[in-house]
A protein has these predicted regions:
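Anion (oxyanion) recognition and catalysis
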Residues: 31, 106, 110, 166, ...
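Short, structured coil segments at secondary-structure junctions
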Residues: 55-57, 64-65, 168, 225-226, ...
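Asp-based phosphoryl-transfer active-site loop
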Residues: 1-17, 192, 223
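Mg2+-dependent phosphoryl-transfer enzymes with acidic/Ser/Thr/Gly-rich catalytic loops
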Residues: 20, 179-274
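Conserved acidic, metal-coordinating active-site core of Asp-based
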Residues: 108-211, 217
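Short hydrophobic/aromatic-enriched beta-strand-loop microsegments
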Residues: 58-64, 136-138, 229-234
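Active-site phosphate-binding/coordination module
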Residues: 20-118
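Residue-level detector of anion-binding/catalytic polar loops
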Residues: 36, 171, 228-229
Length: 274
């Protein structure tokens, strides 16, 4: 059994226009072969649900930087005693609630003695201006359940922000424009490992091979826990934070690189894709 875990922005989706057209033929063949393609992303459930419908994904997905795994109720065999019913899904939650994330951001701001601006503090127009997201996508990006992105303060180093956040019992993914405050138990690697184990539990006699595709250091934890990690490069080269790891680097950026890499891996495993 093959499991494909993938980041979205800059990996399955182009970084500049969020396009995915070049990956559609491969995605369609994977669905025909019942090979799960599992998004692992900082995006919200609302954002991923729309994308899944557009590109035909039907399996579980991991949101908000590994804060939660959503399993469609049609795949209840992957649930566990720790999961809870969440509408159309079984939910495995690793992160805090959104209320706790907002309270945490306030505590971090007080500890840094620096006002911090979270997504909830921004209007939809301001988020559109900062991110370039379409208005309807801004609404979905604001529909957060477990984490709070905030504008990265420029007068502190990444290390200073991380140390302050950790002392308060949270984690932070520091980015150039936005950072993400997440729960102490959350993380892409942990969520991926948990879901892999659920597949093992549901099919104990099956040989499971895991693939992971990502383009940034935020994907490291995911890439480190799969058997076949693949780096999707930027337009010029891979991210410096992913260099010198001996991992496969896709032949192109974005969705074209994703499609090329997945096709090559499948063919090497005698799963022949066109």
């Amino acid at each position: 059994m093959l499991l494909i875990f993938t980041d979205l922005d800059g990996t399955l989706l182009n970084s500049d226009d969020y396009g995915y057209e070049a990956a559609l033929p491969v995605l369609k063949q994977l669905q025909t072969l019942n090979i799960p393609v599992i998004p692992v992303t900082s995006k919200t459930r609302s954002e991923v649900e729309v994308l899944r419908e557009k590109i035909g994904l039907t399996d579980a997905f991991i949101v908000e930087n590994g804060s939660a795994v959503f399993i469609p109720i049609s795949q209840r065999n992957l649930a566990s005693p720790q999961t809870q019913n969440w509408g159309d899904y079984d939910l495995m939650q690793f992160g805090f609630s959104y209320t706790e994330a907002r309270q945490g951001l306030k505590a971090v701001a007080e500890a840094l003695n620096q006002p911090l601006t979270g997504f909830a503090d921004l209007t939809e127009a301001e988020i559109h201006q900062l991110t370039g997201l379409a208005p309807e996508d801004v609404k979905r990006a604001k529909d957060r359940e477990f984490t709070e992105p905030f504008i990265t303060p420029k007068n502190f180093t990444s290390l200073e922000i991380e140390q302050t956040v950790n002392q308060l019992g949270f984690q932070v993914v520091v980015g150039d424009r936005f950072s993400h405050l997440i729960g102490q138990e959350a993380g892409k690697g942990k969520a991926v490992q948990w879901l892999i184990q659920q597949y093992h539990n549901s099919q104990p006699d099956a040989k499971i091979i895991t693939v992971g595709l990502g383009n940034s250091p935020n994907d490291l934890a995911m890439l480190e826990v799969v058997e076949i990690p693949v780096i999707i490069p930027g337009k010029k080269c891979p991210h410096p934070g992913l260099e010198n790891r001996g991992w496969e680097v896709a032949s192109a950026s974005g969705c074209q690189g994703w499609a090329n890499a997945v096709r090559e891996i499948c063919n090497s495993l005698n799963i022949y894709l066109n």
